[in-house]
Amino acid sequence: MAVESRSRVTSKLVKAHRAMLNSVTQEDLKVDRLPGADYPNPSKKYSSRTEFRDKTDYIMYNPRPRDEPSSENPVSVSPLLCELAAARSRIHFNPTETTIGIVTCGGICPGLNDVIRSITLTGINVYNVKRVIGFRFGYWGLSKKGSQTAIELHRGRVTNIHHYGGTILGSSRGPQDPKEMVDTLERLGVNILFTVGGDGTQRGALVISQEAKRRGVDISVFGVPKTIDNDLSFSHRTFGFQTAVEKAVQAIRAAYAEAVSANYGVGVVKLMGRDSGFIAAQAAVASAQANICLVPENPISEQEVMSLLERRFCHSRSCVIIVAEGFGQDWGRGSGGYDASGNKKLIDIGVILTEKVKAFLKANKSRYPDSTVKYIDPSYMIRACPPSANDALFCATLATLAVHEAMAGATGCIIAMRHNNYILVPIKVATSVRRVLDLRGQLWRQVREITVDLGSDVRLARKLEIRRELEAINRNRDRLHEELAKL
């Protein structure tokens, strides 16, 4: 959305994000590893190749140089380094005596089954591990009662699961007693636990890791982050996000078809984005059919939204509005409270916005006769679908690198992608703050350029548009006269 609201650009969310990064030290980014790497990687046929690392490599957190390009030794604007993920030539766990556990938590997301499949097959095919266990229905599956439902994961069970959405392990929200969960891991002989879930899940993973460390048991707890909103700090992409954008574009195109097929038609599409508007912003740019884009990072009033709608109707009889679910939480009164994951319950801004648009059009019926408003909420269809091919590849890469690093003893960390490199980030740092849209960044600039702007002169813009159309007609008329003269 291209609303001219400069005072809102430096929102509290953006400030908090930058302040947090300023307080992070290199020591905070140091990845914990279980002591000892006594076993050679069993993939001996590749042992002499560079895919297997003996030492830790790093990338700069921010590749932008502080100095001018002419500087002989440019220095990054940030002193922070992130540890690169890799397969290791020597590993911590004895593969044939290693048991892997997998748990999926929180809401479902495209790619969950791909991650489960890749972890399982990497453990079996590459490392020949003793067992792979799947814990059912989130952290409940690690409780004393829930552990009775654990299932064995093998090639036959996971071969085709990537064709389907959801998770074959099931999922749930909410914490469990960490002591009870570590008891389960010890009882079943689990050496590595992969936790696939959002920030709440990973905070729970950190507690499990700390309890295991307190007991002195040799267990790696390794996170594969799942956030369809793409709001993970230190990461530029999370699995399922690209698929969500693709499906969101389909919903926007449907809303556009409804809007342009009516006299003063409005299509409203609610997309996922509790605290971050990445899906809404990218879908707006990708579809090139959105006229207003509302995201949590740029809060505006009901009056301003209706002014944007008026501005759009000054030069078109259709309007498509995209709204992220976390936008406009001060527009109405919700039920209050928090869900089992600790997230604040949101009001349904999609329904509220739709009703307010209808009321506005009804109050201005003489100006906008025969107006219609169509509302589309594709959220559950998006998160339940299988991933796109590119997302499936991304899931496989995250999962296989997670197995390689966990086998080498990395623990209390997550796998993430930054600047097209795969890195390890300690869970404590990764979950300390959400990543949000930079309202001064390139993505938001693109959104502003293609959507309605209260700061622009609509009459002048319409006049220029008509003038361009007339010039095109005149050029075509001259061409036709020339062709006619030749006959």
UniProtKB/Swiss-Prot annotation:
Primary localization: other
GO molecular function: 6-phosphofructokinase activity; ATP binding; metal ion binding; phosphate ion binding
Motif (Peroxisomal targeting signal): 485-487
Top-rank lineage group of the source organism: Eukaryota
EC id: 2.7.1.11
Site-annotated residues for Important for substrate specificity: G200
GO biological process: fructose 6-phosphate metabolic process; glycolytic process
Keyword ATP-binding: yes
HAMAP family on file: Phosphofructokinase_II_X
Protein name: ATP-dependent 6-phosphofructokinase
Organism classification: Eukaryota, Discoba, Euglenozoa, Kinetoplastea, Metakinetoplastina
